[in-house]
Amino acid sequence: MGPITFQASRSVLAIVVLLPLVIVRRRARTKRIKANDRNVQTYSFRTTVKGGLLCGLMLCSASILQQIGITGTDVGKSGFITAMYIVLVPVLSFFISRKASVRVWVSVAIAVTGLYFLCVSGGSLAGITKYDLMLVACAFLFSLQIILIDCFAKKVDGVELSLGQFITTTVISVILMFV
């Protein structure tokens, strides 16, 4: 099974698990609305679809790059590079007017230094492979996905957003399987 087929299979499984949960939650929300429960939060279908598409595109792209990237580099290196999304989130958030503490910036510097020592051998950039670059792109896209989720989480139902992400991921992955 190739990386894209694996991604498609994983996404289909997520849909199978999430779809019944979304149906049950929607029915419960509808009953509460009909009972005039003022504490029921309603969500825009359009915003949910938009969030599912954008977050799903990031999730699919990042996951496929990760699946391909891990085939060409060692486990420790791939794990460290992929986990760089943890420090990339505050860096990218900075560009949308979210401030990070000094501790975060020190952590970013340490992580980037670690990335340098893992990927660069003998002071030459020749040690960086295309698989390493795929994993860096993967970390960047996972960071964008997290930032997008943060933006949409306040506006939509989280379970429905997850379902939308996996539907998007499945559609893209299935198309790519046959390309």
Regions found by a protein language model. Give the residues of each.
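Hydrophobic transmembrane alpha-helices of multi-pass small-molecule transport proteins
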Residues: L18, A100-S121, C138-F142, I172-S173
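Hydrophobic alpha-helical transmembrane segments of multi-pass membrane transport proteins
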Residues: L21, K50-G72, L92, Y116-F117, ...
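Loop-to-transmembrane alpha-helix entry segments
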Residues: K50, G79-T82, S97-F117, I128-D132
